[in-house]
Amino acid sequence: MRCPFCGHEDTQVAETRESDEGDVIRRRRRCPSCDKRFTTYERAELAMPAIVKKDGSRSEFDRSKIRASMMLALRKRPVSIDQVEAALGRIEEKMLATAANEVPSAKIGEMVMRELKKLDKVAYVRFASVYRSFEGVDEFSRLIKDI
């Protein structure tokens, strides 16, 4: 790594420590040219794909929006916050596993529906009715028969 003080190309690692959470590595470095010390931090960069909405616009992945939608569907249902967080984690893992730069919002909606179906059937029906814009009882009946 280049020294930030003198620009020397090769610095030496004097000390390495991992953070308590294990997600960051702290390194103390020394420059053999100017003998100054400095600290660097290393962490994995996990870039979530951009979300492509139905109208073609793009936005960043926002975990809080998905959590809010799930919590609305799960209102007054016997599902814990930990279960919701675990489901959100699985959705994020699937997003990262796609290795795509962009993901259609419809795909995320389907992932949310699958997770809600596992957590609570009533919440699944609530979410599906809004997500799929149900307009009649027949659509509810078909969805419930598929469960």
Swiss-Prot record:
Zinc finger (unnamed) in chain: 3-34
Pfam family, one: Zn_ribbon_NrdR
Domain of life: Bacteria
Keyword DNA-binding annotated: yes
GO biological process: negative regulation of DNA-templated transcription
Keywords tagged on the record: ATP-binding, DNA-binding, Metal-binding, Nucleotide-binding, Repressor, Transcription, Transcription regulation, Zinc, Zinc-finger
InterPro entries: ATP-cone_dom, NrdR-like_N, RNR_NrdR-like
Cofactor note: Binds 1 zinc ion.
GO molecular-function terms, A-Z: ATP binding; DNA binding; zinc ion binding
Cofactor(s) the protein requires to work: Zn(2+)
Domain ATP-cone: 49-139
Summary of the function given for this chain in its UniProt record: Negatively regulates transcription of bacterial ribonucleotide reductase nrd genes and operons by binding to NrdR-boxes.
Family membership: Belongs to the NrdR family.
Name of the molecule in the record: Transcriptional repressor NrdR
